[in-house]
Structures are given as structure tokens and as C-alpha cells.
Amino acid sequence: MTLIDHLPNDADPDALFEAFSGWAEQQGISLYPAQEEALIEVVSGANLILSTPTGSGKSLVAAGAHFTALANDQVTFYTAPIKALVSEKFFDLCKLFGTENVGMLTGDASVNADAPVICCTAEVLASIALRDGKDADIGQVVMDEFHFYAEPDRGWAWQIPLLELPQAQFILMSATLGDMSRFEEDLTRRTGKPTSVVRSATRPVPLSYEYRTTALTETLTELLETRQSPVYIVHFTQAAAVERAQALMSINMCTRAEKDEIAQLIGNFRFTTKFGRNLSRYVRHGIGVHHAGMLPKYRRLVEKLAQAGLLKVICGTDTLGVGVNVPIRTVLFTALTKYDGTRVRTLRAREFHQIAGRAGRAGFDTAGFVVGQAPEHVVENEKALAKAGDDPKKRRKVVRKKAPEGFVNWGENTFEKLIASDPEPLNSRFRVTHTMLLSVIARPGNAFEAMRKLLEDNHESRKNQLRHIRRAIAIYRSLVDGGIVERLAEPDAEGRIVRLTVDLQQDFALNQPLSTFALAAFDLLDPESPSYALDMVSVVESTLDDPRQILAAQQNKARGEAVAQMKADGVEYEERMERLMDVEYPKPLEELLFHAYGLYRKSHPWVGDHPLSPKSVIRDMYERAMTFTEFTSFYELARTEGIVLRYLASAFKALDHTVPDDLKSEDFEDIIAWLGEMVRQVDSSLLDEWEQLANPEVETAEQAAERADQVRPVTANARAFRVLVRNAMFRRVELAALDKVEELGEMDAESGWDVDAWGDAMDAYWDEYDELGTGPDARGPKLLQIEEDAAHGLWKVRQTFADPNGDHDWGISAEVDLAASDEEGRAVVRVTDVGQL
């Protein structure tokens, strides 16, 4: 029986509480006092602010809230900050209430949208609240991880529903809420329902705290010896986490039997990248690494090993994600300060408690441990003093090591203050956008009154409210000037005194607001141009969010190459530095796109919320004929390869969905096939997750993740594999054109074509010709011949050089090993000859 089968005939609060607590008892769950108190408030119809520690069963209270809403024939919404958590909760609630009663809205996907229980992101709920307001069919809202209300970029989405859905019962939940009296009063005033705050500092697994002045390796060794593992070591940069993992390889973490168990669980898992090969060494030693820059499949493997109790230490960052299920007994802080993008500062109490709260696993541990590590210079000074012993003379002679220049100090007092401090109050992040005005204007009724209430009755200070009002007036005027909004002489049948002149459903996209601009910009391109397909890629890339790490790496590379060239040209230092300021990352079609964007914005003012950003990541990778590994190595992005992959997956989805089928040329289809297959071979989980969100009835999130680790043969997608082969061959042409025989020799040494062989072959070519073409014609299909020899599992390939005379009598001959390609997830090309036909 599912939970929904326990719904009582009578929606009386007592009957509801008895029914739900009875179901919990059948599941072997004993309610904590805070859970009981919270559920009593929920079934009575009150708003609830639930602030209890991590692992104290907030999810059970949320289930009780949905149960109550269903009993009262209400639509209930559950919101979470990330799509992955929304998806996870969707499947959890399907088990409790049945698939027919649960739906999901993420912006990417809409599943069973008319169900009485809806899981969605905060932004989706905010969009509904702006569009429908008090008329929205929403009787209850459960907002998980409510501390995101204070997030600078996204916090507005947690505030809007509170302002615009007075008909709803609200359940706000987080482990780190701080003073919520303002919200308590505000919710009661707006909804007319009493608001209860349920707090509990009592953790199911109590925490103990300790500040250490020993060296980190000594601290860690003691924690391992006293069975306080697994230990999560908190770092404040991804690089520091990886460096720590490498440094800890000298400590013997596991027994031989434990290492065998790790190897067995890893099985045939494929570590395909440079970082992956390092991670393989770490995890086999009992050390995990976990941060946002990793490939999802590597993070999943670390989580899987941790859940099996096989990792003794996990080196990670302070951004241990929401919904990440990593069991931890001890949290060890390497520092109590962090760089926040502007300055180095002491951790905030909320940040500290959010991480410290992960220590101790309910149902597994009887206690959790939080350790604060003293700064390195303090540790060294303590060590020197200990060596001096009790001899006053020796102690006076100790030369104390000073803190590094610019060091923001912390100490035991800092640690104790953070432990004792409550999380800071949540600050409002309200903002006004074109989207907000368009949504409010589109709803029935007087839009001016609705906007005035929204702008003057929110959680902002009066000073900020006036700033938002000025912004709203400016946006409204731009909408009128652009012909998007018109004033009506008389109210229409639904009470509107202003109306939209465009169809929002056609011209406005929640997830890809610039997709309509991309469609318009395609008309500016020349279909006959040899660069047409790549120009379409550049249009779509300009509408995507900037992957800052990639763009910074591209700029650094471009500046390094520019400096080398200027030095070779004898340019003086001062002039070099001046010229260097103009060197940026590649921005194809920049002038054309910005001109088109300016014109488009006049008739579509709302795109002003989303600035255009020309860039070349997909195009750069394709033009250089690089594999994923070659690209991350070339730009030194191995530590952030997860960010690279996320951008590639996002670009693939945008290219596949934004470009109409009638505009997709053969070359463009090749690029999409190549990109999709490359992403899948590196880590298919991002695309699988997207497809699974769109078709959740096919498989669960767990099944999709399991399938993601089962890599399909790269040769299965024939079109994509041909592009991979073509790129592998043309990569050699590009390197040959630059006379980079060392790289070619490194690439082909195993097939007998080392640096000397390549050098001799290219010397012979340069004796005959002074150029080697690498333009669009040089990589065209006319200069590549593929002969498929399926019987022997080989493709025989000939890449002809584009020589300046058009003789086309030089080239590269190679064999492609299909079985080896499937094994390695890439085109395995073995050069057999370089020379004249």
C-alpha cells in the first residue's frame, strides 16, 4: 500500500495526523518530537517554518504536508533549488502517492503537469506565481532548502511565491534559517493563516567539536586510528582539494582486503581523462575527491564508494552540493576563511553550519565530529615550541613563523564563535525584470495595481523599493515604445487596462530566452558559405551562459601566443603590454551579432535581461579537430573538465532544439552528431538526465545513472563516428601544417610514426610545397576517403593534403581499429604512411 491509500475519509486534523503517523509506524519510523509538532501544525492548516538540523527528517514532514493537501483536495507544490533534486524528489513522491498523482516541471520538461502533487524548481513556481497570482490553482507550497532565499542571483524566486500566492499554505524548510520572525509575521499577514516556527537544535546524531594545532596529516592519522572516518576535508578551491588528495597518498589508508573491495566495486569503470586517471589512483588508495568541476560520472563513483563505506577520506570543497548523498562521520575544516570572488573573509555562520551539519549519519553513527584546523604557520610555531620543551631559554630563542602577507587570520576563538552563532538573517534578493512585467501584464485584472502591490509590498527596504519602482517604469516605457504593450481606452472583459500585443508562449522562453533571437539571426547567414554550419553554431553559442573558466583559459592561451609572436617580432615590452590588453578569447561574428541584437531588442525589449555573449567553444574545438581530452589539455582545463562537459552538453541541447530542421545542413547535422557522441563517450549522464527528465516513465533517475556508467560502443552511431575519424585525421593535418612534428610523433609513436618518421615525411613535403591548407575546403569530404573493411574490423582511411598547386598527391594513410575504438570511446587511428600516393 502507498501512502495515498491511507488517506482518511474525514479531513479532520486529528484524523489526518493519526492516519499519517500510523503509516509512519508501519514503515518502522518513530517520529521525533519536532516532527510531531511540525505535523500537528501542518494538518491544522497553519503555515510552518521548520528549522531543524540535517538528518532530522524534514522530508517526512514534507510528505505529511503533501498528504494533508491531498486530503483537502488541494494542489501541492514541492520546490527544490536544483533540477537533479527535483527529479529525485519526483520519484520519491511517485512511490508514496502513485505516478498518476505526481507531476514535474523543470523548464526542461513537463511531466503530468495536471497532477495534484507537483515537483519543480523555485524559478518555475515563481513564474506561475507572477503569471496567475492569487488565481493560481495552488493550495500548498513546500519550499525545501529555503536558505536559498538569500542567494544573490536566484533568491528572488524564493520570495515571489510568498508575495503572490496568498491562497496557499507555506511550509519553509532548512537546517540553517536563523531568525525567521519577520517571515512569521509576513506570512500570517498575507495568507490569513497562523504561522508556526518549529525549531530544534537537537540532532539525531549529536556533534562534538575540536580545534587542532597539530599538522593536518597528524590530525588525520589520529582520526583514522580512532575510527572517526570517513573524514570530509573541506577546502576552499578545487585545486587545493586535488592537491591534498595527492599529498595524502603517502598515508596508508586501507588494508589489502579493503583495497580489493574497492577494486571490485570499481570493476570495469572507465577513467577516460587525465584527471580520471589520477582519481583512479586516489580512490584505490581509499581517498575520494568531490567538487563541482569534476565529471558527473566521477562524482557518482566517489559517492558510490563512500556509501559502501570504502573511502576513508574525501577531499572536497565547501560547496558540497544540496542533495549530494555522501555519508560523513567527521568534517575537517582546513581553514575558516574563504575568497568569495571579491575578498578573503571569515566564513559566515550559515556557511559553517551548512558544512558542519553533514557530519554524523543518522542510522549509522552515534556521534558526528567537526574539527577545525589551525593555520599552517600556527601549527609550525606550536611544533617549534613543543620541541623547545619547558626550557624558558630555548623557548625564547624560537623564531616564530609569521603569517603570509595579506593573510586573513583565524583561530580557536573564530572556531568557537562560529559554533555558537546562529545563521545570519536571510536578506531579500528581490529584483525587477522584463519577464516580471510581461507576466503580470498578461494576467487578468489591473496590471498597474498588481505591480504597485508587488513593488511596494515586498521584503525590500524602502530605498530599494524606490529603485525597483524606477526600474519597472523604465521597463514599462520600453515595452510601450517597442509596441509590445498597449494601453486600452476601456478595461477588457477580464479587467485589463493594458495588454500585450504579442503571444508570450511563442516569443518567450523560460529556459532559453535568447532562442528567438537566434532564430532571427540565422536569416543573416549565407547558406552557400563554406562556414555556414559553424556560423550557425556561433549564433547559438552567443545565446548561452558564459563558461568563465573556459573563456579565461582561451584568453590566457591567446595572450601567451601573442606575447611569443611579439617577442619574435622584436616588439618592446611596454608596447607588448599595451597590445596585450586588446587580445581576447575568440568571438566569431561579434560585430554582426551585436548589430542584429540591438535591432532585435527594440521590438523584443525583454531580451535586455539576457545579454548576448559571442564566444567560440564548440566551434574552436571543431575547427581545431580536437577530442575532449585534447581540448582540456590544450587549455589546461583538466581540473574543471566537468564544467567543460556541462557547457558542451548544454550547447548540444541548444543546437538540437533551437535550429529548425529545415535549416540543418549536412555539415550542421555532422557537427550535432559529433558533439552528442563526444559528450556521451566522455560521460553520458548529462544527456541521459535530460532525456530522462523528458521521459521519466521510461526509467528512474537511479536507472538512468546506472545506464550512464555503461558506455555504449562509439562505433554504434555511424554518422558521429565518421566525423570523429575525419577530425582525428584532420587534427594531424593541422599539426603538420604548423610543422609540430613533436606532437605528431607523440600521437602516433605506437603505430611506428615517431617524431623522426614524421619529421622526415614533412621535410619531403616542404621540399616540394611551401604551404599546407587547413581551410574549409581542406577538411571537406572530397579530400577524405574511407574504405570500410567490416570483415577485419577496420576502416582504411586516406586524408589528402590541400597543397597550394592543387596536385592532391600527398596525404596521410591510416587504419581505424573499430574494436579498439569501442574500448577507448574514441576513434583509434593508426597511421600507416605519410607521403605521395
Q: Across the structure, where does each feature detected by a protein language model lie?
A:
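Conserved C-terminal RecA-like helicase domain
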Residues: 77-79, 87, 94-103, 238-313, ...
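Conserved segment of the helicase C-terminal RecA-like domain
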Residues: 330-333, 337-339, 345-386
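Conserved interdomain hinge at the start of the Helicase C-terminal
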Residues: 212-236, 243, 300-308
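Conserved two-lobed SF2 helicase motor
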Residues: 114-130, 285-296, 305-325
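Non-catalytic terminal extensions of ATP-dependent helicases
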Residues: 288, 307-308, 393-394, 398-798
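Compact beta-sheet-dominated globular domain cores
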Residues: 802-837
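Conserved P-loop/Walker A NTP-binding site and adjacent catalytic elements of P-loop NTPases
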Residues: 21-23, 29-205, 212, 230-235, ...
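Helicase-associated low-complexity/disordered flanking segments
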Residues: 1-40, 44-48, 255-284
